[in-house]
Swiss-Prot record:
Organism, as annotated: Syntrophus aciditrophicus (strain SB)
Xref: InterPro entries: FAD-bd_PCMH (IPR016166), FAD-bd_PCMH-like_sf (IPR036318), FAD-bd_PCMH_sub1 (IPR016167), FAD-bd_PCMH_sub2 (IPR016169), MurB (IPR003170), MurB_C (IPR011601), MurB_C_sf (IPR036635), Oxid_FAD_bind_N (IPR006094)
Family, similarity comment: Belongs to the MurB family.
UniProt EC number: 1.3.1.98
Top-rank EC class of the record's enzyme: oxidoreductase
Protein's recorded name: UDP-N-acetylenolpyruvoylglucosamine reductase
Domain annotation FAD-binding PCMH-type: ranges: 37-205
Gene name of this polypeptide: murB
Length: 312
């Protein structure tokens, strides 16, 4: 049931006045997540600039309306009951620019909603080296930085030089790399802070070499990951020196189904949507994996995906 304040005509009109992008009520979230599951948001709002985002969040805080920010919807499971309050979709924050610095590096600035795929394409076009490891990672800049996304021995912390956040005081604040504390698949940042922009330091490179590495990574991902089905990416973080996918494969759970959700037969650390999966099915499989791995190997797997919302 929608929170009462979002039934108010005045509040609805105020929401619409905050942004030039879409304002949708009772909007199903399955179409906004890579897993393709999830119930409705009370409201989904799409700011088109940092200024609109600031205005929107200030209004939500003033009215005590809970909100959740949403990037590309990867690494996210929305429960079947959906999300109360407002989902703020950052896909409208799409500015991308770059320039040389005095040290000869290229500083790329990307707003939170820019897909990593767009930056990878920029790297090919402009012969920029350093972000090849992002090839095939389906997220956007904001989420990738917050979770310190990485692959092939590289992580966001290796290339991020600064981020701009909307902080808990509702002010835009720029934090330098030395002010940021990264861990494995995590940036230590207040839950109330919203990443709105990030800066990366890249190096001039050879286009042929960069393109070849990107093609190699794409081929490797296609060979190992179930890219022909909707999925949320890696379900669990890798324990130290032990791939989660290997642990799951050892339990014999690959191919296990709950409804239309299935533990991938191709890679044990992926759960795929065969067509009409429910979030409850996905969560059941996550709990089944955690229990089986703990029983078989005495290892507690930690989820990499975030589970939000209410049960249906």
């Amino acid at each position: 049931m929608r929170i009462p304040v979002l039934h108010d005509f005045f509040i609805k009109e105020q929401l619409k006045s905050c942004v030039s992008g879409a304002v949708l009520f009772d909007e199903p979230l399955d179409r906004y997540t890579s897993m393709g599951v999830g119930g409705p948001a009370d409201a989904l709002v799409v700011p088109q600039s940092m200024e609109e985002l600031v205005q929107l969040v200030r209004f939500l805080r003033k009215e005590n309306i809970p909100f959740l920010t949403l990037g590309n919807g990867t690494n996210l499971i929305v429960r079947d009951g959906g999300c109360r309050g407002v989902v703020v979709a950052l896909r409208g924050l799409q500015k991308l620019s770059w320039a040389s610095d005095p040290e000869g590096k290229i500083r790329v600035q990307a707003e939170a909603g820019v897909p990593l795929a767009s930056i990878v394409q920029l790297c090919i076009k402009e012969s920029l080296a350093g972000l090849e490891f992002c090839t095939g990672i389906p997220g956007s800049v904001g989420g990738a930085v917050r979770m310190n996304a990485g692959a092939f021995g590289r992580e966001m912390k290796d290339v991020v030089t600064a981020i701009t956040v909307l902080n808990e005081h509702l002010e835009l604040e720029t934090l330098s790399r030395r002010e940021l504390s990264f861990e494995y698949r995590r940036l230590n940042l207040s839950d109330e802070a919203v990443i709105v922009c990030a800066e990366f330091a890249l190096c001039p490179g050879e286009r042929e070499s960069i393109s070849a590495e990107i093609s190699e990574i794409l081929a490797l991902r296609k060979s190992k990951h179930p890219l022909n089905f909707r999925n949320a990416g890696s379900i669990f973080k890798n324990p130290r020196n032990l791939p989660a996918g290997q642990l799951i494969e050892e339990t014999g759970l690959k191919g296990t189904r709950r409804g239309d959700a299935m533990i991938s037969e191709k890679h044990g650390n992926f759960i795929v949507n065969l067509g009409h999966a429910r979030a409850a099915d996905v969560v059941d499989l996550i709990e089944e994996i955690k229990g089986r791995v703990e029983n078989c190997r005495a290892i507690q797997l930690e989820a990499e995906v975030h589970i939000v919302g209410e049960d249906g």
